[in-house]
Curated annotation (Swiss-Prot):
Alphabetical UniProt keywords: Chaperone, Cytoplasm
GO molecular function: unfolded protein binding
Protein name listed in UniProt: Prefoldin subunit alpha
Family the UniProt entry places it in: Belongs to the prefoldin alpha subunit family.
Length: 145
């Protein structure tokens, strides 16, 4: 393997490491959205059982206003692109469950891509180790870039 090929391999390894880190960040984002959607469903179910609940409404910078929830059948749901719609509890739960299915697919896809990237990283590390051994056996000192 030539010096140029070794440098290309190292660049590929760096790109793969960056890609793997990006996938990990995406996976964490998806997991956060998944937890949030699951918690929202549980909250809606709780509200349907106890409609006259006390709660805290955030008004910014860690400040909350105590209030009572008076609606036992409607909820405002952000559906994206700055659009919010009013839905009854079962419809809101159904919408959130559909979103959870989409998120689960995205998590699985991201996990598969991460596994592939990890495999390619391991192969690259093995190639680097072989290169280092070959260079040591030939008496050629490894050059750092």
């Amino acid at each position: 393997m030539s010096q140029e090929q070794a440098e290309q391999l190292m660049q590929q390894m760096q790109m793969l490491e960056t890609y793997f880190a990006d996938l990990s960040q995406r996976e964490n984002t998806f997991l956060g959205v998944f937890r949030e959607a699951t918690a929202a469903i549980e909250s809606i179910k709780s509200l349907s059982k106890n409609p006259e609940s006390d709660t805290l409404v955030p008004i910014g910078l860690g400040t909350y206003v105590p209030t009572k929830i008076s609606s036992d059948s409607k909820i405002i749901l952000n559906i994206g692109a700055g659009v919010a719609v009013e839905k009854d509890f079962p419809s809101a739960i159904n919408y959130l469950e559909e979103r959870i299915k989409e998120i689960e697919i995205a998590i699985q896809d991201t996990a598969a891509k991460k596994q592939d990237a990890a495999q390619r990283l391991e192969q690259g590390k093995a190639q680097v180790n072989q290169l280092m051994q070959a260079m040591q056996q030939s008496g050629q000192p490894p050059k750092s870039g």
